[in-house]
A protein has these predicted regions:
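N-terminal Rossmann-like dinucleotide-binding module
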Residues: 1-43, 47
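Conserved acidic residues
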Residues: 33, 83, 104
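Residue-level detector of anion-binding/catalytic polar loops
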Residues: 54, 83, 132
Length: 212
């Protein structure tokens, strides 16, 4: 069986990338084929290079506009024959053309229980609204902001003292687990879109990896 090849897009330190490398890379037929960033100084690129993974930088300033940059990124990913594009702390919206090109093959992890608190600073939004429970969502990416079909979610209780640091630490821990779990399910062909409702995906929970 063929290897399931994933590309990871990053902007920051790469803790979610590191979790993918530790939990999935080279296991069960899953391979991190390449890592790309919109930030040349991203620590995540160092993590990828340390693991012997090909990297590239696609800055918006190096292209005429976002669409041109995303077209170049898409060509680079297509040349590497990736099966899935994973947004792991990639802090920029993808252009509609890129999303259409990789339709249902892009996943993102978001630190809230969508559709609540989309966009930036989801933890701050949750604290400002006084919620007692927030969480983590892994979803397919569409043309909107954190609006794609939900693959997996997990709740996280907000500390009674409203401490942001403790909440962020727990959310990061859950992000690492949930994103890896979602990738494993997608690689096992256990996630499928609903032909009658584009908002819904169906997930088989008990599966074995079908690649490798």
């Amino acid at each position: 069986m063929s290897t399931f090849r994933i590309a990871v897009l990053v902007s920051g330190t790469g803790t979610n990338l590191q979790a993918i490398l530790d939990r999935l890379h080279g296991q069960g037929g899953i391979e991190v084929a390449c890592v790309a960033s919109n930030k040349p100084g991203a620590r995540a690129l160092e993590r990828a290079r340390d693991a012997g993974i090909e990297t590239a930088v696609f800055e918006r300033a190096a292209h005429s506009d976002r669409q041109a940059r995303d077209a170049a990124l898409g060509d680079w990913l297509a040349e590497r024959e990736v099966d899935l594009v994973v947004l792991a702390g990639y802090m920029e919206l993808l252009s509609p053309g890129f999303v259409q090109r990789f339709r249902d093959r892009i996943v993102n992890v978001h630190p809230a229980l969508l559709p609540s608190f989309p966009g930036l600073d989801a933890v701050g939004q949750a604290l400002a609204h006084g919620v007692r429970v927030t969480g983590v969502t892994v979803h397919l990416v569409d043309e909107g902001v954190d609006s794609g079909p939900i693959v997996l979610q997990r709740a996280v209780e907000v500390p009674l003292d409203r401490g942001r640091a403790a909440l962020e630490q727990e959310i990061h821990r859950v992000e690492h687990e949930l994103l890896s779990e979602a990738i494993r399910l997608i690689a096992a062909e256990a996630v499928r879109t609903d032909p009658e409702n584009a908002r819904i995906v169906h997930v088989e929970s008990q599966v074995e990896t079908r690649h490798g």
